[in-house]
């Protein structure tokens, strides 16, 4: 048995996506304009995590110059299929939706395959069907005309893995569970016991955030919603609850019939969320063909046990605060704004130390200043 303590990734690790290869689990998160981008983590017990790299680790993969601080890289999805890892995400500043691939999750990852104007919207995901075909699932504005802010829909289209281009016709499959839904986003598709399930967030990534689910026997048709939607939210607990904004989930199983979901949430302090949106884990069971998140509890737990052998790492993201400056590479937890390769630091001017080189830009400005930071955890 292993004890899971939430959040499993403390600090600014929003929009988590998870996949499994054998007994190994991998999580990726949004990174916006911070560089390198899209941190990737590894675990063997879902409780203890080590950072194994940053997927977008060179400027050619991460063109975010001039972007607003909350633009850049949105909501990545990670999947493993037939010997290859796929990460798909949105660069809302340059190029929009793209895919990178790797045989090893530690890298190197490929140059981006941009999907172009054929893939509008944000929060893309990939689904691999039983026949090996791959499908793109994303969000886009209501094509009949946006009636209100957040009037979007979820759509799918086949992806040719040889050309990395969308083929065939796209189809809208869902607009959200709640009447007048805003921001149906973060969609993920799974095939379980003969049904295609669509898990997604709605309500906006704030007080009304939630997780909803729909299903269908066929991929290219309108999905039916779960009668219990939203299947998970903290909106009913109030803004004084210790954990708020819960939503944006991704399911994973352990290969033995046990299911879990990762999601984002925030821990407020004096009405502010200084650590941003963090990554949490919850148990999932299935009843009458629908997922139940945090069964018997109904909210994110501070800690719980799961039937899995414990596996610890030398330096875990959950408890290690020490950063060294020995060697030729920066600690992978450190991030710059926009670009970390343009001479803002040195690790060789003084042995075992970091030297920063000033720029004329101020940190109070929205500019590419001389800056290296690490995510606050508590």
Give the residues covered by each predicted segment.
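Carbohydrate-active catalytic/glycan-binding domains of CAZyme proteins
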Residues: 1-378
């Amino acid at each position: 048995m292993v004890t899971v303590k939430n959040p499993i990734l403390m600090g600014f690790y929003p929009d988590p996506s998870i996949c499994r290869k054998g007994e190994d689990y991998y999580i990726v998160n949004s990174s916006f304009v911070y560089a390198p981008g899209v941190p990737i983590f590894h675990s063997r017990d879902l409780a203890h995590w080590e950072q194994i790299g940053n997927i977008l680790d060179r400027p050619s993969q991460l063109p975010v110059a001039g972007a607003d601080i909350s633009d850049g890289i949105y909501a990545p999805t990670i999947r493993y299929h037939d010997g290859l890892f796929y990460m798909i995400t949105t660069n809302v500043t340059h190029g929009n939706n793209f895919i990178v691939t790797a045989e090893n999750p530690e890298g190197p990852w490929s140059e981006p395959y941009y999907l172009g104007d054929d893939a509008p919207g944000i929060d893309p995901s990939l689904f691999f069907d039983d026949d090996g075909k791959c499908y793109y699932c994303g969000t886009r504005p209501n094509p009949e005309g946006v009636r209100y802010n957040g009037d979007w829909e979820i759509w799918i289209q086949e992806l040719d893995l040889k050309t990395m281009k969308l083929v065939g016709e796209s189809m809208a499959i869902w607009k959200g569970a709640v009447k007048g839904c805003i921001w149906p986003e973060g969609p993920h598709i799974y095939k379980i016991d003969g049904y295609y399930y669509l898990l997604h967030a709605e309500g906006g990534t704030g007080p009304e955030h939630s997780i909803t689910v729909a299903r269908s026997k066929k991929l290219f048709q309108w999905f039916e919603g779960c009668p219990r939607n939203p299947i998970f939210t903290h909106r009913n607990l109030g803004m004084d609850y210790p954990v708020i904004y819960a939503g944006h989930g991704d399911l994973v199983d352990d290969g033995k019939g046990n299911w879990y979901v990762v999601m984002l949430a925030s821990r407020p302090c004096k009405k502010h969320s200084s650590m941003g949106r963090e990554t949490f884990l919850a148990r999932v069971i299935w009843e009458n063909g629908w997922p139940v998140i945090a069964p018997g509890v109904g909210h994110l737990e501070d800690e719980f046990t799961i039937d899995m052998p414990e596996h610890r790492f030398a330096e875990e993201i959950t408890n290690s605060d020490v950063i060294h400056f020995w060697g030729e590479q920066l600690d992978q937890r450190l991030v710059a704004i926009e670009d970390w390769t343009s001479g803002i630091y040195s690790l060789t001017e003084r042995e075992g130390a970091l030297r920063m080189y000033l720029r004329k830009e101020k940190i109070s400005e929205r500019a590419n200043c001389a800056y290296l930071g690490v995510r606050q955890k508590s």
